[in-house]
Amino acid sequence: MLKQVVDIPASDDFAGFTITDAAGSPVEYALLSKERTQRDVFSPVNLPGVLDVDRYTLYLYAQGVLPFAAKGYRIRRAERTPALFEPLQKSEPVMENACIRVTVGEDGRVDLLDKKTERLYEDILDIEESADYGDSYMYWNNGEPFFWGRDFPAAVEVLEHNAYRQAIRITREMCVPAYYDFSQKKRAEQLAVCTVELTLSIEKGDALLHVGYT
């Protein structure tokens, strides 16, 4: 599934469009937004200039697109374009597609159900924070205790929930040693608040749980 931006010259006055692949088969898509804007054009044919365009942002349900690969699609004029997505209404922190179901508890605990095998994986994801006075080649902890995300309160927020993409953010404010004292080979007694965010997402027809963090 791809998130794409399509610019169509305003002078073409499209009421809508369809998208097909190289074989001429229709490709499913959903419209996220539409706006009239301007685009700088630099071309040996059209010369540099500014064009008024209708800009469409959409989810394209493209399958079989490999990493670092290119795949072409054709846009054709149509009588109408599908309606825009409705605003987010679902607030329950559960994500589900045909392959997996992901549940996030109020405490930030993450459980994943594999629908194919009917196996439930419980508490699958956490943040580990530890001391490290090694170098670029090795990690060295010196036996000091770890700090775990589960030991700190979690704020859970549903970011997106629709037929194409679902996303949940887990935020924790972890209180950890402010720095490492290399002269004493131990962590400082002074504490600092470290805000950690995990963003979980799934996509239509995809058996993977995508994880981002800051």
Where does each model-flagged region fall?
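Catalytic and substrate-binding regions of extracellular carbohydrate-active enzymes
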Residues: 1-214
